[in-house]
Amino acid sequence: MAPLPGAELVQTPLQLYRYLLRCCRQLPTKGIQEHYKHAVRQSFQVHSDEDNSERIQQIIKRAIEDADWIMNKYRKQN
């Protein structure tokens, strides 16, 4: 299950970036939101020079799985 509707539509790094920032808005506190926004920005910068489309799709899939795990973690705590 994806953290937000529309995860299956994510095809490009920019779409992934926007999707993950929207996920961050769903987190419970401002501090947690800022922490994960920073992590998203850092990861985007680290992988910005990636040009292998297969690798990009792997990154997108893994990022959505990680976002799902994080969202479930904070849903269980509340």
From Swiss-Prot:
Belongs to the complex I LYR family. LYRM9 subfamily. CDD domains: Complex1_LYR_LYRM9 (cd20269). The gene is Lyrm9. Signal peptide: none annotated. Coiled coil: none annotated. This is LYR motif-containing protein 9. InterPro entries: Complex1_LYR_dom, Complex1_LYR_LYRM9, Complex_I_LYR.
